[in-house]
Regions:
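Cys/His-rich short segments
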Residues: 1
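Conserved AdoMet/S-adenosylmethionine-binding subsite of the radical SAM
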Residues: 4-149, 155
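Short, intrinsically disordered, charge-balanced linker/junction segments flanking boundaries
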Residues: 134, 166-169
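Short glycine/proline- and charge-enriched loop/turn segments
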Residues: 155-164
Length: 169
């Protein structure tokens, strides 16, 4: 109730925007977000999820997608080995998520961070373009600059930052 009330406070200021669930991994909160998105849709507010697509599709996630207007999907890399190095996860899950969005016809914006020395070479960007072209639900590709704003999270957890040697442009 509180979250929906807070979102609605901005209703008259929102011309083309809406409510975006982001931070951490919103798909981990699928049942909660489903209820929020249902309420926001009842108020005619646009809903979006900003996700890494790193989780397998579950019934709870699929139900959330029923109430999602837009997915902002991070594609870290289109190379399996590089994806695993950067995320410690499998690109197959990210790919399956995008394929599921394609099957469902859910509008998607792909986001890709240019990490110097990792994801910024011409060949990799060309592969990304070819990959995205296979999915008609992708309306936009956003190429984002690399930054080091997340370093402190690793420090607080006592973990080494995997891209510590990569300077921000």
């Amino acid at each position: 109730d509180e979250l929906v009330a807070e979102a609605m406070r901005y209703y008259y200021f929102i011309k083309k925007g809406g409510f975006t669930a982001t931070g951490g991994e919103p798909l981990l909160q699928a049942p909660f977000l489903t209820e929020v998105f249902k309420r926001l849709h009842a108020e005619r507010l646009h809903t979006a999820i900003d996700t890494s697509g790193c989780l397998p599709i579950t019934p709870a996630i699929d139900t959330l997608l029923d109430h999602t207007d837009l997915v902002l999907l991070d594609v870290k890399s289109v190379d399996d080995d590089q994806y695993a190095t950067l995320t410690h996860g499998s690109r197959a899950t990210n790919h399956a998520f995008l394929s599921h969005l394609q099957e469902r016809g859910i509008t998607t914006w792909v986001r890709h961070v240019l990490v110097p020395g990792w994801t910024d070479d011409d060949a990799m960007l060309h592969r990304l373009g070819q990959y995205v072209q296979q999915h008609s639900v992708v309306e936009r590709i956003e190429v984002l600059p690399y930054h080091t704003m997340g370093c402190y999270k690793y420090e607080k957890m006592g973990l080494p930052y995997p891209l510590a040697d990569v300077p921000a442009p």
